[in-house]
């Protein structure tokens, strides 16, 4: 598991390495397990303004800012979506907003999760 002291790039490398070890069904099972392990989001936060629109599943991303660091709570009605969001939230949780803004799409692409997402996710 990652720690809050790790940088974004270190967390990306951790998750990318874990995901690359798995193929096919095993990768999906791993992502589903991340969904099960993710912190529960109270129903009071499952509001329209926290919902990601355009996603086939219902996905809520609840941001919190503490001491100039971002924390994300995520939930979904679909395990693959929730697991994927939980991995991304883990990468960015506890990071400074300036560090998050420096992340490129190439950095995130190293995770290899784009391939499993449909256009609706």
What are these language model-derived features?
Residues 2-3, 14-17, 76, 98-103, ...:
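C-terminal binding/interaction regions
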Residues 3-45:
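Extended low-complexity intrinsically disordered regions
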Residues 14-15, 84-87:
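A general alpha-helix detector
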Residues 21-25, 75-80, 120:
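Structural motif
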Residues 27, 57, 80-85, 96, ...:
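Amphipathic alpha-helical interface surfaces
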Residues 42-64:
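Structured beta-strand/loop patches that form or line metal/cofactor-binding pockets in enzymes
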Residues 64-80, 89-93:
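Conserved interaction-surface patches within small, structured recognition/assembly domains
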